[in-house]
Amino acid sequence: MTGGKSGGKASGSKNAQSRSSKAGLAFPVGRVHRLLRKGNYAQRVGAGAPVYLAAVLEYLAAEILELAGNAARDNKKTRIIPRHLQLAIRNDEELNKLLGHVTIAQGGVLPNIHQNLLPKKTPKAGKGSQEL
């Protein structure tokens, strides 16, 4: 029985490989594809669209987490909290533009004191250096 209908997997077939691993991504391409189909965004979804979207989402997540990790390290902490996410997003010009209308719970506000509220700087008299 060397025909094609012997049942089971063929002996020469390769092991199954996920689309995420084929694309070198950590985000799930199959899940993104399913969500695109079920979300009624379009009647049909191409094969490359979920791969591209998963790559974009992975990049954004990595960018935000890197900046938040830097903010946590600046505050001498080892755990990222919502405050670090808020500081990372609001201090980055492009991320702030992208997520400008997003409210982060427990994020707080950026430290900012208006220039008029700061004490006036008075010039201090030098010790004889200006008398020439």
UniProtKB/Swiss-Prot annotation:
Sites of N5-methylglutamine modification: Q106
Residue numbers bearing the Phosphoserine modification: S129
Primary subcellular site in the record, as a coarse category: nucleus
InterPro entries in UniProt: Histone-fold, Histone_H2A, Histone_H2A/H2B/H3, Histone_H2A_C, Histone_H2A_CS
Keyword terms, alphabetized: Acetylation, Chromosome, DNA damage, DNA repair, DNA-binding, Methylation, Nucleosome core, Nucleus, Phosphoprotein
Assembly and oligomerization: The nucleosome is a histone octamer containing two molecules each of H2A, H2B, H3 and H4 assembled in one H3-H4 heterotetramer and two H2A-H2B heterodimers. The octamer wraps approximately 147 bp of DNA.
Role, per record: Core component of nucleosome which plays a central role in DNA double strand break (DSB) repair. Nucleosomes wrap and compact DNA into chromatin, limiting DNA accessibility to the cellular machineries which require DNA as a template. Histones thereby play a central role in transcription regulation, DNA repair, DNA replication and chromosomal stability. DNA accessibility is regulated via a complex set of post-translational modifications of histones, also called histone code, and nucleosome remodeling.
Protein name: Histone H2A
Organism (species): Emericella nidulans (strain FGSC A4 / ATCC 38163 / CBS 112.46 / NRRL 194 / M139) (Aspergillus nidulans)
